[in-house]
Amino acid sequence: MPVLGSQRRLLGSLNCTPPATFPLTLAPNRTGPQCLEVAIPDGLFLSLGLVSLVENVLVVAAIAKNRNLQSPMYYFICCLAMSDLLVSVSNVLETAVMLLLEAGALAARAAVVQQLDNVIDVLICGSMVSSLCFLGAIAVDRYISIFYALRYHSVVTLPRAWRIIAAIWVASILTSLLFITYYNHTVVLLCLVGFFIAMLALMAVLYVHMLARACQHARGIARLQKRQRPIHQGFGLKGAATLTILLGVFFLCWGPFFLHLSLIVLCPQHPTCGCIFKNFNLFLALIICNAIVDPLIYAFRSQELRKTLQEVLQCSW
């Protein structure tokens, strides 16, 4: 559980900067220059967590309800929603306990609070790792479906998908336990940062290659229809925009947190890095925002899933 106040503590003692007292303040660092510090109110954390919680519960419920959605691709999307769901549950639980403790409505011994803090940290770290893994798995699944379409159902089988899903969850749990235990070791932090960079590179390479193939296919159709420029340019712009949104959201939501981890290793005492450390809460809020955006990008674009969601909302089980 974080230290009471506006500055949260995640994954042990990753951040030890003093709490901010205003929504937007300029906090001086040790050398005198001004640091821009954005404080995120607990109410905003709670609201973001609840929105993400509802969205991802709906995704999981829709996939569980509709047999047509029970395929490897949708299982990966479902697991991504479950990972984001863990982020939301951890955030809501953490914020609720913080507010109750601050209000004096909950009395707990320090040892109990510490144990609860450890559980929440494991949930948050595990959900982060699993989210990144399933984002990568979805990218690989889409790549195979495009470049190996005829062999897709023999390559991406249900048993193989289940083994991949099980391996990701086990690896995420072990990683979170190791990270919580050895969070103050440089190697552990660098491994996490390296993992993020690897996932970003994997997604960028696969999606760029898929966009290139799609544009090539569009050019072929355009030549047959003798309308090369309008079709190709329009399709290319639409594909580039989709790719920019997909990778941009991923980088903007996850990048600042892993930048924070990198700077802990590279310049823990430097004043400029100290300015970045002060915005740790903002980085956590961005991760929660990613849990809100993921269903919009990966799940709600499916017409079949949207139709099932309507049935779920109407309680027509």
Swiss-Prot record:
Family, per entry: Belongs to the G-protein coupled receptor 1 family.
Membrane topology, Extracellular segments: 1-37, 94-118, 184-191, 267-279
Keyword annotations: Cell membrane, G-protein coupled receptor, Glycoprotein, Lipoprotein, Membrane, Palmitate, Receptor, Transducer, Transmembrane, Transmembrane helix
Domain of life: Eukaryota
Glycosylation sites: 29
Function, in words: Receptor for MSH (alpha, beta and gamma) and ACTH. The activity of this receptor is mediated by G proteins which activate adenylate cyclase. Mediates melanogenesis, the production of eumelanin (black/brown) and phaeomelanin (red/yellow), via regulation of cAMP signaling in melanocytes.
Membrane topology summary: Multi-pass membrane protein
Lineage: Eukaryota, Metazoa, Chordata, Craniata, Vertebrata
SMART domains (UniProt xref): 7TM_GPCR_Srsx
Lipidated positions per record (S-palmitoyl cysteine): 315
Molecular function as annotated in GO: melanocyte-stimulating hormone receptor activity
Name of the featured protein: Melanocyte-stimulating hormone receptor
Subcellular location: Cell membrane
Residues in the signal sequence: none
Cytoplasmic side: 64-72, 141-163, 212-240, 301-317
A GO CC term attached to the entry: plasma membrane
Segments passing through the bilayer: 38-63, 73-93, 119-140, 164-183, 192-211, 241-266, 280-300
Subunit structure: Interacts with MGRN1, but does not undergo MGRN1-mediated ubiquitination; this interaction competes with GNAS-binding and thus inhibits agonist-induced cAMP production. Interacts with OPN3; the interaction results in a decrease in MC1R-mediated cAMP signaling and ultimately a decrease in melanin production in melanocytes.
